[in-house]
Swiss-Prot record:
Chain's gene name: tmk
Organism: Exiguobacterium sibiricum (strain DSM 17290 / CCUG 55495 / CIP 109462 / JCM 13490 / 255-15)
Full protein name: Thymidylate kinase
SUPFAM superfamilies: P-loop containing nucleoside triphosphate hydrolases
Membrane-crossing residue ranges in chain numbering: none
GO terms, biological process: dTDP biosynthetic process; dTTP biosynthetic process; dUDP biosynthetic process
């Protein structure tokens, strides 16, 4: 049986990581085999690349270098962890994937969407998530949550205009792929959001099982 690849996306501070862990706990309790991971990172090599990308000391990093580092981390991640887990029939829950690169480096930095998408399709051999949950959080609320959290990484330090372009990019992707990308209101309480997320994921998994 082929596994299921589920990703979560959205602005920084939207609560994706917390919700993904709660979802993993619930699915494990339901008897599913879960692999929970994140980008950039997910592997030993990917985590080293992550430290380069996010380090605030590297403000001189060229934008194309940033794009390629994300893709390099993703290539390692897909081949070392994600594809083997899917081949074993597991559910992979991933905090960010290619949609993030399209939103942040495509819409955010102003590179063509086709260019960013092409680089990442080569890096992943065209792997696409089965289901993506896009956490909808305004730029102002995202910024406030990040400030409350403390020190900002190199990407989080970018200005509000960048954040707005990223947000608009995510919303555009949701319109373009409504079957795959499900919008989630990130302003809900943790409990309410978790109830909504778990309900949809379990419904989706049961549907896939019936069709398999």
């Amino acid at each position: 049986m082929t596994g299921t690849f589920i990703t979560v996306e959205g602005p920084d501070g939207a609560g994706k990581t917390t919700q993904l862990q709660l979802l993993a706990d619930r699915l494990t309790a339901e008897g599913y085999e879960i692999v929970m991971t994140r980008e950039p990172g997910g592997t030993r090599i990917g985590n080293e690349i992550r430290s380069l990308i996010l380090n605030p000391d590297f403000q001189e990093m060229d934008e194309m270098t940033e794009i390629l580092l994300y893709a390099a981390s993703r290539a390692q991640h897909v081949n070392e962890l994600i594809r083997p887990a899917l081949a074993a029939g597991k559910i992979v829950l991933c905090d960010r994937f290619i949609d993030a690169s399209i939103a942040y480096q495509g819409y955010g930095l102003g590179y063509t969407i086709e260019q960013v998408r092409s680089i990442n399709q080569q890096a992943t051999n065209h792997l696409t998530p089965d289901r993506t949950y896009l956490f909808d959080l305004t730029v102002s609320e995202s910024k406030q949550r990040m400030m409350d959290r403390g020190a900002l990484d190199r990407i989080e330090q970018r200005d509000d205009a960048f954040r707005q372009r990223v947000y608009d990019g995510f919303m555009t992707l949701a319109v373009q792929e409504p079957e795959r990308i499900q919008l989630v209101d990130a302003n809900q309480s943790i409990e309410s959001l978790q109830t909504e997320l778990c309900k949809d994921v379990l419904t989706y998994l049961k549907k896939r099982e019936r069709l398999s």
